[in-house]
């Protein structure tokens, strides 16, 4: 009888171990489901971040395109202004190459200077009176 008791005791301990293994398997599957749920949440967060980055990238691209158009317009206007300035400089060169033109330019400059002096004197007199 002692042998049967020992046999039953060893059998019980043997099956208790299997019960523990089966529970472990259940725990493993529960842990697997938990890990899957965590992975799904992480994937959703990643998708949200990717879509956010995609929107930001689109906004940046649109802003860059707007700035490129603006820079093109500014560049075209600068080229136009450069052309006008070079034409004006060429005309001044033509005027100052001839002596008669040089004399008339000096005369005009003296009149402009005289006009400015008179203007400031009149303003000064009005300031003193007022």
Swiss-Prot record:
One GO cellular component, as annotated: endoplasmic reticulum membrane
Claim: Secreted is one of the keywords in the record: no
Topological region Cytoplasmic: 1-106
Domain t-SNARE coiled-coil homology: 33-95
Gene Ontology terms, MF aspect: SNAP receptor activity
Domain of life from the UniProt record: Eukaryota
This protein's UniProt keywords: Coiled coil, Endoplasmic reticulum, ER-Golgi transport, Golgi apparatus, Membrane, Protein transport, Transmembrane, Transmembrane helix, Transport
GO biological process: endoplasmic reticulum to Golgi vesicle-mediated transport; protein transport
Protein purpose: Required for vesicular transport from the ER to the Golgi complex. Functions as a SNARE associated with ER-derived vesicles.
Family according to the record: Belongs to the BET1 family.
Name this polypeptide is given: Bet1-like SNARE 1-2
Upper taxonomic lineage: Eukaryota, Viridiplantae, Streptophyta, Embryophyta, Tracheophyta
